[in-house]
Amino acid sequence: MGNNLMQTDLSVWGMYQHADIVVKCVMIGLILASVVTWAIFFSKSVEFFTQKRRLKREQLQLADARSLDQASDIAAGFSAKSLSAQLINEAQNELELSQGSEDNEGIKERTGFRLERRVAAVGRYMGRGNGYLATIGAISPFVGLFGTVWGIMNSFIGIAQTQTTNLAVVAPGIAEALLATAIGLVAAIPAVVIYNIFARQIGSYKATLGDVAAQVLLLQSRDLDLNASASAQPVRAAQKLRVG
């Protein structure tokens, strides 16, 4: 019995080769899912690193701005994909569309809504691919378990056909079946961990972008209030002359 068991190839590749076609399909699917997980990890890690560093740099540069026009001049030196520049453009576009309106509070409210929608859209864009990670992390263990159950069923069928409980007959089939579960866990665990890492990074990135949006809204609010005060000064001066 021991010699027969030793002659059986129980390496990972050997177990795969001797596995049932259904179990093989399960293993291949799980391996592909793992490849997708790591591809998303490396691609999005580079994306997060570059985007976050760029946004931090732009935020520091915009901190010196004292008006929306000055912020726009600073943003002119940003890259074409600059999100900070897009937020500034949103505020300027709302000012252009609201020309002639004396309701400054309404302008601020509409600008805040536009900036909020832009930040939300960026968050959705940065979160692309996370759905795949969540799906892989959720279903991979069960897919692997399906392969295990199928493999064990085949092992029992083999026992019935050979009419023996010899370990050399039973062990290889069970090992092949358990390999499917192991591959399922190998696919699922990194997917869940990477998903949580990216979820935190997206939250942090959106918070930083929200700070930039608040800074843009602050500059616009200051400009509107200063313009309103400047427009009101001649009126107050005329009223004083009449009273005098």
Curated annotation (Swiss-Prot):
GO terms for molecular function: transmembrane transporter activity. The keyword Transmembrane helix applies. Residues 1-20, 154-177 are periplasmic. It is found in: Cell inner membrane. It is a multi-pass membrane protein. Involved in the TonB-dependent energy-dependent transport of various receptor-bound substrates. Protects ExbD from proteolytic degradation and functionally stabilizes TonB. This is Biopolymer transport protein ExbB. It comes from Salmonella typhimurium (strain LT2 / SGSC1412 / ATCC 700720).
